[in-house]
Amino acid sequence: MLILTRRVGETLVIGDEVTVTVLGIKGNQVRIGVNAPKEISIHREEIYQRIKSEKSQQNLC
């Protein structure tokens, strides 16, 4: 895992098409903005896990 430090307003670039910008920090929460092409799905981890679980259950039926 790559670990980076960024300040509010600073951006990370992933590949040629994805950027992640730190928008704000309030207590222990960090607000980030993600710019990516529409064909790239972006989910919070808990939502992604739920989607995977639902797809897995559908495949069992």
UniProtKB/Swiss-Prot annotation:
InterPro entries in UniProt: CsrA (IPR003751), CsrA_sf (IPR036107)
Compartmental location: Cytoplasm
CC annotations in GO: cytosol
GO process terms (BP): mRNA catabolic process; negative regulation of translational initiation; positive regulation of translational initiation; regulation of carbohydrate metabolic process
Listed GO MF terms: mRNA 5'-UTR binding
Keyword terms: Activator, Cytoplasm, Repressor, RNA-binding, Translation regulation
Cytoplasm is among the record's keywords: yes
Record Pfam families: CsrA
Lineage top rank: taxon: Bacteria
Family: Belongs to the CsrA/RsmA family.
Primary role: A key translational regulator that binds mRNA to regulate translation initiation and/or mRNA stability. Mediates global changes in gene expression, shifting from rapid growth to stress survival by linking envelope stress, the stringent response and the catabolite repression systems. Usually binds in the 5'-UTR; binding at or near the Shine-Dalgarno sequence prevents ribosome-binding, repressing translation, binding elsewhere in the 5'-UTR can activate translation and/or stabilize the mRNA. Its function is antagonized by small RNA(s).
Subunit and interaction comment: Homodimer; the beta-strands of each monomer intercalate to form a hydrophobic core, while the alpha-helices form wings that extend away from the core.
Protein name: Translational regulator CsrA
Gene: csrA
